[in-house]
A protein has these predicted regions:
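Bacterial signal peptide processing site
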Residues: 20-22
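Short, surface-exposed linear motifs at loops/turns and structural transition points
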Residues: 24-127
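C-terminal motif of bacterial Sec signal peptides marking the signal peptidase cleavage site
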Residues: 15-18
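Generic preference for well-ordered secondary structure
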Residues: 3, 34, 46, 76-80, ...
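Bacterial N-terminal signal peptides that target proteins for export
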Residues: 1-8
Length: 449
């Protein structure tokens, strides 16, 4: 039998059976919930503040469930880790569906025992504005990977950053700059960062908004020339592609912003890393790799991706021509034309979104390699060249999911396709987007930064 659900307008007090120890004696688990609300700014975000009588807990989490979900629903609930350093243990419940009922309880560990509160009813969630229209076509329901997709409206209007759950429902949304290329939660999952595409170097914008919508900053100083993409790093740092000089397709800088607003140019993305195409550069995607503190960077003009250490040391080049390449014998020439989103895993699996020359009617491809990257050599073996179901000469993304599925984002055609390990379609979300990033929950570091 489920626990009784309580909802009181003011403070909520509840005692569960004695658990934990306080000075060596059993102590009752008496919880006080001082705030139980949904955010006024983003009404799919729950806000809970609480306390536990007696000895403070050493760890805690809040577990919630949606009331009466349909049988096919994947997003039925979740759990939020509690930051015990925050006042009143303030915790946000993220990933809630619009206009839905939820119940939650608190689990707190102290003295080697777990205190579990009764269930409390969260106020009904509200409707999101802006919230794009999304249609979903499911081919293999049992093969869907639970989780969330963090994305943006791309080049469509109205502009927004938003999050989809695995059912195709929008569970979070906020205003975004015009033509937002990437929206991405920071490493701690506290803020949503966004960057405008700014493809022709005429002025861009980076901004962020907290996940409850209460804190925001537009037009981040010093990043007015940011373009296309950003990536997040531990410690609240954000790294962005920034045009180095005025003009058409110049080199870029990788600029890292710290939480205190300090900007640091880590390195230039230009002839020091690879040869331009007829003197033109166009870096268009970047990802931070926590497993060896490095970055992968894509450039559509010379049709290549490079891997660079956080201090600017070139590791390898994949794609383009190797004649005179700064990577030397750590270069693997390839014949594809135009590339954007990509994903490098720690085991050497590498996936690339290959746009092709769409003025010739080319269909987008997803190319998978197995990279062998050692101190002595670098090689790339082709594993798969998947012919996609969309076309578009800019943007586009790909990500390998933990369960073996692959998420393909056709930004121009306005669809995100989940494929099973055999490259069969699992489901398709039809919605106009920029780049897109999957994550299993909305807490903690992303699986692909």
């Amino acid at each position: 039998m489920g626990r009784r659900v309580f909802l009181v307008a003011a403070a909520l007090l509840a005692a569960s059976p004695a658990c934990g120890t306080d000075g060596g004696t059993a102590a009752p688990c008496t919880f006080t919930v001082s705030k139980n609300a949904v955010s006024a700014k983003i009404p799919t975000v729950g806000e809970v503040e609480w306390s536990l009588a007696g000895r403070p807990p050493s760890s805690a989490k809040i577990v919630w469930t949606r009331q009466d979900p349909a049988g096919s629903t994947l997003n039925r609930g979740g759990e939020a880790p509690v930051d015990l350093t925050k006042p009143n243990y303030r915790t946000l419940l993220l990933g809630l569906k619009q206009v839905s009922a939820y119940a939650f309880h608190i689990e707190a560990v102290r003295g080697g025992q777990t205190c579990v509160s009764p269930d409390y009813a969260l106020p009904f969630t509200g409707s999101l504005t802006p919230s794009p229209d999304v249609s979903v076509a499911v081919s293999e329901a049992a093969a869907r990977e639970p989780g969330f997709i963090v994305t943006s409206s791309g080049q469509s209007v109205p502009t927004s950053a938003f999050i989809l759950d695995a059912d195709g429902d929008v569970v979070w949304a906020a205003d975004a700059p015009d033509s937002t290329g990437r929206a991405l939660m920071d490493y701690a999952g506290e803020n949503m960062w966004m960057v405008a595409l700014n493809p022709i170097n005429e002025g861009g914008e980076m901004r962020y908004v907290s996940m409850d919508g209460e804190q925001a900053q537009q037009n981040i100083a010093g990043l007015e020339n940011a373009h296309h993409d950003l990536t997040v790093m531990p410690g609240g740092k954000v790294a962005a592609l920034v045009w180095s000089t005025p003009g058409n397709d110049p080199p870029s800088d990788l600029v890292i912003r710290s939480p205190d607003g300090t900007l640091n140019t880590a390195f230039t993305i230009g002839s020091n890393l690879y040869a331009a195409d007829s003197g033109l550069y166009h870096a268009d995607a970047v990802h931070y790799l926590p497993f060896d503190d490095s970055f992968t960077i894509s450039d559509r003009n010379p049709n290549l991706v490079v891997k660079v250490s956080a201090t600017g040391t070139l590791d390898w080049q994949l794609g383009g021509t190797c004649a005179g390449a700064p990577a030397g014998d750590r270069c693997s020439a390839q014949g594809w034309l135009v590339n954007h989103g990509h994903h490098l895993l720690a085991d050497g699996t590498f996936l690339l979104f290959n746009n092709g020359q769409n003025d010739n009617g080319d269909v987008n491809h997803i190319i998978q390699f197995k990279l062998n990257d050692t101190r002595a050599s670098f090689t790339a073996a082709l594993v798969e060249d998947y012919t996609g179901t969309g076309s578009g000469n800019n943007l586009g993304d790909v990500q390998r999911l933990p369960g073996g599925n692959t998420l393909v984002t056709y930004s121009i055609e306005g669809k995100i396709v989940e494929l099973d390990p055999d490259w069969n379609e699992v489901q398709t979300f039809s919605v106009r987007v920029g780049y897109a990033s999957w994550r299993p929950s909305l807490y903690g570091p992303p699986p692909r930064a």
